[in-house]
Amino acid sequence: WQRNPYKGQNFDLQTDIPYLFNSNVGMNMKVNIFRQDSTFANVKALPAFYYHINNRQKIGLRGTFENSTILDSLYVQGKDYNKKGIGVYFDMTEPSDIDLFLYKTKINFGYDYLTTTYTKENIKSPQNQFYFFGEYNYHINGNHFLNIKAEGAMLDSKVNFTANELYRFGGWNSLRGFNENSLSADFYYYGSLEYRYLIG
């Protein structure tokens, strides 16, 4: 659960079962609820099944079920919508020998084909969604490390997006110097280079 300075509240819940019935098939379920003060609320569920290529790599198939409701009738930048779709993704994680690092290398990218229905206008629109994340902790020598990170995402549609369906980013885990989830766009990318010195 996270609250940002702009009265936005974000709740994430995730469960993962890596080896169903002792097979190489796993299951993942994510639920996200985002509420922006009293203007709108988004609820998203992402059920997924994936296959372990090896102990570091997996490919998966996921569904997207999203519902957004405008809570304030004076909020004209957003619209009520339902979103459904299917997507594929790839994930690679290389573990780290350093306990403070979650991993040495992580690469995740995916594509989703979505159908969005704007309920009050009775408009249906196909959408394409692309996502990429990559991070690498490079050991220079001794206690000196370099963290290299890149992330990007894009929504593509023939219909203009509403404010309540845009990506929200910014903050400690993405663009530092901005408040959490204070930026929104249908396309973003960024890269960062960070020097780290481990004490001890």
Q: Which residues fall in each region the model found?
A:
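Gram-negative/organellar outer-membrane beta-barrel architecture
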Residues: 1-108, 168-171, 182-185
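C-terminal outer-membrane beta-barrel translocator/porin domains of Gram-negative envelope proteins
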Residues: 86-200
